[in-house]
């Protein structure tokens, strides 16, 4: 299960985040085969 942050202004899609680690950065790591919302 991956919690999601609500979309922020200027951000069309929510980014997954992990507790204690802040926003997940798909440009650094994308551990599962899903479309990359950062692109």
Curated annotation (Swiss-Prot):
It is found in: Secreted. Antibacterial peptide against Gram-positive and Gram-negative bacteria. GO terms for biological process: defense response to bacterium; hemolymph coagulation. GO terms for cellular component: extracellular region. Induction: By bacterial infection. InterPro entries: Abaecin_antimicrobial_peptide. This is Abaecin. It holds the Pfam family Antimicrobial_5. Residues 1-39 are annotated as: Disordered. Keywords: Antibiotic, Antimicrobial, Immunity, Innate immunity, Secreted. Its main location: secreted.
């Amino acid at each position: 299960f991956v919690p999601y942050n609500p979309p922020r202004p200027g951000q069309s899609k929510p980014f997954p985040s992990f507790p204690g680690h802040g926003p997940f950065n798909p440009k650094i790591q994308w551990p599962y085969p899903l479309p990359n919302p950062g692109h």
